[in-house]
């Protein structure tokens, strides 16, 4: 048999060995896509902190459509604006667990190290419960907690409804009492509230204020106007666009 008949397979075998050796040195396998199994590089942090929006009782994510649209106009992306609906009949402690998952998810998705939480009405209770009871002491992942017409000290209008979340909003309920015990602005976040003397849902209207927070009285706005009013929006935006903890 001619020598060439042996030489060709030998050359092919040598080429295969060289290919396998090169793959081994590079860390890639012929059975997997190049780069598979390598550490995924997280995205760089955005120029501002992402925002989580928490609506109130008998409401939904539709609460925030106007404000979310304004934040987009001012340079925020869809990924940085987390607006979701939840079952408002459940305990605010249960909703706080949902908030915890949403916060961790948006931080992972955006590469950010901190998040701002903007709430309306009852949403203030679950957000504050999350910071106080579900975050480790000294944890800094939440930069700011913003309450618009928050039920921070309860409201007498909550005597008109019966779900557990609503009973938790009643003045001097065990939920509100424990949440406000010792320190109303718990932990490391910046706290800010906006309240209106014309709020027909929060009564007394000053119930929305927090000791230790920056409390801003608005113009004569109704409860649902607090998240629609442009002046309130600009004030909230100017607060959350700050990055005091760095990026």
Q: Each predicted region: which residue ranges?
A:
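Bacterial N-terminal signal peptides that target proteins for export
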Residues: 1-15
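Residue-level signal for mature regions of secreted extracellular proteins and peptides
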Residues: 18-19
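C-terminal motif of bacterial Sec signal peptides marking the signal peptidase cleavage site
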Residues: 22-24
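Lipid deacylating catalytic domains
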Residues: 27-247
């Amino acid at each position: 048999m001619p020598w060439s008949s042996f030489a060709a397979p030998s050359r092919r075998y040598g080429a295969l060995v060289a290919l396998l050796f090169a793959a081994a040195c590079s860390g890639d396998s012929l059975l997997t896509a190049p780069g598979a199994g390598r550490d995924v590089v997280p995205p760089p942090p955005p120029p501002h902190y992402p925002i989580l929006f928490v609506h109130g009782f008998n409401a939904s994510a539709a609460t925030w459509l106007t404000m979310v649209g304004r934040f987009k106009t001012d340079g925020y992306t869809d990924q940085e604006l987390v607006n979701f609906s939840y079952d408002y009949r459940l305990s605010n402690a249960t909703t706080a667990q949902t908030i915890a998952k949403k916060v961790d998810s948006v931080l992972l998705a955006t590469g950010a190290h901190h998040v701002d939480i903007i709430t309306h009405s009852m949403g203030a209770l679950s957000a504050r419960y999350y910071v106080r009871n579900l975050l480790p002491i000294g944890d800094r992942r939440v930069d700011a907690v913003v309450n618009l017409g928050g039920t921070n000290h309860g409201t007498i209008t909550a005597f008109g409804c019966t779900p557990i979340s609503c009973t938790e909003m009643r003045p001097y309920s065990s939920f509100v009492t424990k949440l406000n015990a010792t320190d109303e602005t718990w932990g490391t976040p910046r706290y800010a509230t906006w309240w209106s003397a014309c709020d027909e849902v929060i009564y007394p209207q000053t119930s929305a204020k927090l000791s230790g927070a920056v409390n801003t009285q608005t113009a004569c706005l109704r409860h649902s106007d607090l998240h629609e009013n442009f002046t309130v929006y600009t004030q909230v935006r100017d607060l959350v666009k700050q990055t005091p903890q760095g990026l």
